[in-house]
Amino acid sequence: MLRSLEDVLTKPGQVSGRALDRHAAAADASHFLLVPEAVVTPTDAAEVGALMRASAAQGVSLTFRSGGTSLSGQAVTDSVLVDVRKNFRDIEVLDEGARVRVRPGATVRQVNARLARHGRRLGPDPASEAACTIGGVVANNSSGMNCGITENTYQTLESMTLVLPSGTVIDTAAPDADGILRHHEPHLYRGLAQLADRVRSDSASVATVRRQFSMKNTMGYGLNALLDFDTPAQILAHLAIGSEGTLGFVAEAVFRTVVRPTHSATALLVFEELQAANEALPALVDSRAATVELLDATSLRVGQRLTGTPPIVRDLRVQDHAALLVEYSATTAEQLEELRQHGEALTGRIGLSQPAGFTTDADARAVLWHLRKGLYASVAGARPQGTTALLEDIVVPVPALGRTCTALTQLFDRYDYRDSVILGHAKDGNVHFMLTDDFADPARLQRYSDFTEDMVDLVLGEGGSLKAEHGTGRVMAPYVRRQYGDELYGVMREIKQLCDPGGVLNPGVLLNDDPQAHLRHIKAEPSVAEEVDRCVSCGYCEPVCPSRDLTLTPRQRIVTLRAIRSARLAGDEALAQSLEEDYDYAAVQTCAVDGMCQTACPVEINTGDLVKRLRRQETGAVAQAGWNLAAQHWGTASIVAGRALDLAAKLPAAATITANQLVRRIAGADTVPLYSPELPRGGGRRRRPAPVGEPVAVYFPACVSAMFGPAQPGTGAPGAAGVQDSVLALAQRAGVELLVPSDIDALCCGTPWSSKGKHTGQETITARTIAALRRDSDHGRLPIVCDASSCTEGLRHALEVEVPPAGQQPLRILDAVEFTAEHLLPRLPEPRRIPSLTLHPTCSSTRMGLNPALARVAEAIAEDVQIPDDWGCCAFAGDRGLLHPELTASATARQAEQVQAIDASAHASCNRTCELGMSRATGYPYSHVLELLNQSTIAGG
């Protein structure tokens, strides 16, 4: 099978049967788990068509996977999994943002980032927009909090390029699309026309379809296409929407975009009981509220446990209460004020349990949204170890929402599902709830089965749909016939047969006559590590992970550990060892431990913490002792590193490279850094100027600048002012005195030891550094300013466990960028601005919230400041980019293309090693932003 698939692809390595690749790709965000036989990565639509023809000939099924954020099991398989994310990320904005052409691997957030500059966005607004991709948005007919059924995928998709299982490619935007379809697929063309006639001629079918699709509904195929469109090509395109990869492959889609609101006002409205909240919905919907989110009493109780919960919830004695999170949005302040006043007037007439007001303050609004979005994380993160989270999604007519939620709560009580919060999009009658259980226990699986039967009866009895926006998948496929009836279910079966007569696309998904299908292949999540056990495999971490296109993502690092543990529990030691053999490079060596995964994770997992511990466990006593010795003599060690770069620059490059490669082969690529000629010379010792006045801060120049000298635009030669000289010059120019510790050469934040798992040396160096900083800061009175963002973060982490001595203040660590933006910039001469600047925020500056200050400094330097749309962590990660340059090359590839297209006057960041990584990736010299500020404020310069 693997050979037959390889034969139709153009590059080696596009088909993998390796155990690590198969198990890493097995899990998506759903509660199902199937391990594919192979993972295939095609490069374009033509290869996908060839794959489908080859799979049909072999009788092998295919399942497409892009973002892997689907929740109903529609993107898992035990056959061939086709990755249509990696090579399908193109985005083309059309008509100044009125339309956009997108391929399936681009995320909604990436598309909206490009549309934002035109004041537009996509209509579908799924909560998973940071990670979900256009492929899934189309395949699931995604909607979201705001779009309802008027701006969802079905309503806003203008055209698509669809690859059928036969290999036929149909661009529905082509004037002769129907002619092409009729010529190449005559049976399909006639069959679609006949099915449209069949449904239209049956008044009962028409009534059922119209009722079903008058609300959010992703159960089964979108039969409304048979009523809404007249030509087979358009019918086919709109049947493909929501078809979950069972009819063909959507290689490209063109969307009509919608206006992007720029002003919002938000309030949390609390009611005495659920029915009162339900009764308020019509008035709120009529008032043109953009969002109305429901939180039931259990949600409010769980929300009270969240950090930062607003007083309106925190101080509430919850009984039968419910709340609606209401938001108005507009494109102008005047429009918003009109909506806000109408909303304020409504609050006095809809029976609130306590007064409420709408706020436009960004921080206050963020607190309210944190409550809503934190509920899922709170319940999922607190679930018992070894249990699986299952998120359900239903819709009923809005008038039935209150009694449906009440009945659901009674079902939770009957089946003893505790903390099962009900929340969702109230104005659409669409709610979500989560169950957590150990479904490997037969009794608990039976409980879930019984609960599901009662839930299905409840929802269908209220005239609702069993899936509003998450797709049918495997979880509701056995119930499609019950929701639609035999006649329309038969129509769906014929649609599948017409498009995919060989049944090669995603069998078992969307239509399944096995009444137990939803109870099979439920994911087991054995406990593997405290740092990551609460992971729900949502995939939100993947777009921000720098190793995502090279080896593994954080989700894949975790699910592979679970696969190893499951194999051992099942007695399959051979599989466990096979996975472990490949795990070290893929999961440990090529992890940047940048913590960006935590910024995207709804349960705040930093997979880097796990990797650091694994590195620590792998480190032998000799290595620990060696790194501890370096910590004890760090002043000498850091200077020697810089001198080594000076020496390398003087020697013939070929000789240096040859010797370096030989040592790497002997000692290992994860031990000896790779030398390359574009590296700068050494940076020299950290200076300590004599103080001339009363210092306002302690200045901690990072040791990385002692190892790596500054960039010299155009030449790479020494002599430019590095970041330490620049900070001191800026402070002097602003009339601000800084104190540099007397023993600065021996001090370090400890990050190199922490990231490598060298805990003994880390303890040695951080103890010395904290003692020196406490001494020179007058026991915490003065702030400490560091000039490299990763080192700033390292110092903050080191201080997390420090207990200040009695009577002393905690040490305050500031980054030089934020210190400059607040204290120096207002006192400096007006900078001479350059035309343009491309800025690279770092993972550390992002995690610490420093990017607004970074942008402020950059905007003082340049007329035009741009951050590439595909910005991300460069993965240089201290020395990781020297040990594994392939990691940085992969992480920066798309960003580098955009940097080169921008071709700015200058390029800047706020961390020396990140500057090295971006210089290597782009060919442009990157400097610290404060070096550029220094140059632009030199008198007469």
Report the location of each language-model feature.
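Non-heme iron-sulfur electron-transfer modules
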Residues: 511, 516-517, 548-583, 604-629, ...
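N-terminal glycine-rich flavin-associated loop
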Residues: 30-62, 84-126, 138, 142-194, ...
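Terminal amphipathic helices with adjacent charged low-complexity linkers/tails
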Residues: 253, 288-385, 420, 424-425, ...
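N-terminal flexible segment immediately upstream of the FAD-binding catalytic core
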Residues: 1-57, 67-98, 127, 175, ...
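Iron-sulfur cluster-binding electron-transfer modules in prokaryotic oxidoreductases
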Residues: 500, 608-941
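C-terminal substrate-binding/cap subdomain adjacent to the FAD-binding core in PCMH-type
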Residues: 137-139, 147-150, 157-371, 523
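Ferredoxin-like iron-sulfur electron-transfer modules
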Residues: 482, 517-537, 569-593
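Iron-sulfur cluster-binding cysteine motifs and their immediate structural context
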Residues: 503-510, 540-564, 590-617, 794, ...
